Amino acid sequence: MSNGKQTAHGPQLDVPIRAAVVSSWADRPGDVYLAACRSFLQPGDTLEAVKPSQLADGGFDMVFVTQVCGYSALPAKVAAASLPALCLEPCRGYHPYHAAFYRELRARGGTCLPALLPEDVAASVRAVRSRRALRGMKLLVFEPHGDGVRTAQLNAFGRACRERFGVEIVVRDTDELKARAARFDARAADAELARWYAEVFEGPGEADPAYLQDAARLYLAQREALAETGAVGVSPHDIAGFLTIPQPVTMPNLSYGPLVFDGFLVCEEGDAEMLVTELLLQAGLGARPTMSNIYFAFRDRFSALASYQEYTAEMELADCRQCFEDNRITLAHFSTSGVLPPEMMVEPRFKIRKTLPSWPAQAMIAATPKLGPVVVARLGEQASEIHLEYGEADARATGDQYGWYRGRWFIRLPDARKFAARCFHQHYAVAPDPGDHRCLETLLRDLLRLT
């Protein structure tokens, strides 16, 4: 079985799977049971009826258990094969005959896939498919070398991702990215800019020609590195590698718009944990997320000001109190709403805005986020925990008078206090919520064993 595909358009999750089917009553399940199993598979998938003793060496992704009633030898053999399992009757609904099998499989540390109703089985199979697709995927992080603490964190996180998910974090130096970009001439940059204006941006916006050429070169450099590594997402450390060096240079942030339009996962600040979170959310939801800073501030007191410079500590405390009172958090990043994928944008294209007031020489993509139900999440630094919340983006606030926070949006949560008590970091991923969480929850909780 091949690993998850990697294309020029980001994660490819619709990969074939191999499923086994076993019976506790016969060497081969009856045709009616096989038909029930096949009804949940796609063309290209493999379904093979095997003896329980053959499970461990068959290269299977999951097992359908049929014709089981009460206690049997099956749980021990399925657990030994380390395969996620579900029980299936011809009616494709839950039967109490399955209870003893599930109970013993759990006791042996095995994985029981949800299968109460046909829609639960379908979601479980989708989760297994996404789990298979994740194996072998790569994500690219550009980080300035020299920070020993962060290097150690990235190495530990990368090992955990390989072991738990089969996902590889490829870490390169930001100096390499800049050197790659320098190899592209003005002609190549201008050709790329022409495509951007035709497909991605409304126009050059607030950036000057030289800055735009630099941004195009950085885009071409990232595309080159993505192609070489086979990575499906990228996160350059745009601050430490470009902005806060002795002589600041053009940040790669404008390039993120074309990259997400291409289909890649993208996040800022070399945040590997965030990039993997985005990948997991896309695998479980089928929708691409964005990333943003979250705040318990910048609410009504801030919105009433004529200038961000008038914001006092007392006002910020009042806004913090408001967040806990009405269970909302504020999102903003680089003076915009973040790197929104096209499906999360109100407009068909990005604008180019200067990152005022903090970095007047830099520019960032800007778009208006769509409102509606969302999933908010972040993976822990050991890749063993995930903070996952369901909420609703229900308001926006824009205006140049708000400076660094001129592109705010607000998410209503079930309980802001509980969110703060578990909060992992200032960066969180936000994805559109399709309303059905079964595949996501099965992938994260049952298959990847994230707590």
Question: At which residue positions do the language-model features occur?
Answer:
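Structural motif
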Residues: R18-G30, V65-C69, E89-C91, F142-G146, ...
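N-terminal basic/disordered segments at the start of proteins
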Residues: S2-T46
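Well-ordered, non-membrane alpha-helical segments in soluble/globular domains
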Residues: P29-F40, H98, L154-N155, A215-Y219, ...
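Cofactor- and metal-binding active-site motifs of prokaryotic enzymes
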Residues: G10, S39-T46, V50-R135, G146-A156, ...
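Long, charge-rich C-terminal accessory regions
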Residues: V266-G391
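Extended hydrophobic packing segments that form well-structured cores
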Residues: V339-T451
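Metal-dependent C-N hydrolase catalytic cores
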Residues: S39-T46, K51-M62, A198-Y219, C423
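Conserved, well-structured core segments that form the ligand-binding/active-site neighborhood
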Residues: R103-A287
